Amino acid sequence: MYAIIKHSGKQYKVSVGDDLKLDHFEAESKASIEVSEVLAINDKELKVGAPFVAGAKVVLEVINHGKDKKVVIYKKRRRKDSKLKRGFRRQFTRVVVKDIKA
């Protein structure tokens, strides 16, 4: 059994027990989150929503919050003696899928 959910403008294929790294959102650690934006669900037969499947929910449990590896952005303009180096670390929220309700 799997479902395709939408979270923060991105789509994820999930099944029970999966460990996901989502974009950061405010939630306590060990909190339970219900995602009702289920685009498709497969439970012996595929149900596709228009745009969402009615009555379907995915229950997620927040494990922790953290930061990814640093991404470095480097711009150089040749022969202009101009360069720019910036970096950032994207924040994420790690969750585990507890239940899929069709």
Curated annotation (Swiss-Prot):
SUPFAM superfamilies from the UniProt entry: L21p-like (SSF141091)
InterPro entries hit by this protein: bL21-like, bL21-like_sf, Ribosomal_bL21, Ribosomal_bL21_CS
Cellular component annotations (GO), alphabetically ordered: cytoplasm; ribonucleoprotein complex; ribosome
GO molecular-function terms, A-Z: rRNA binding; structural constituent of ribosome
Keyword tags: Ribonucleoprotein, Ribosomal protein, RNA-binding, rRNA-binding
Gene Ontology biological process terms, A to Z: translation
The keyword Ribonucleoprotein belongs to this UniProt entry's keyword annotation: yes
Signal peptide (UniProt feature, chain positions): none
Protein family per UniProt: Belongs to the bacterial ribosomal protein bL21 family.
Role: This protein binds to 23S rRNA in the presence of protein L20.
Record note on quaternary structure: Part of the 50S ribosomal subunit. Contacts protein L20.
Protein name (record): Large ribosomal subunit protein bL21
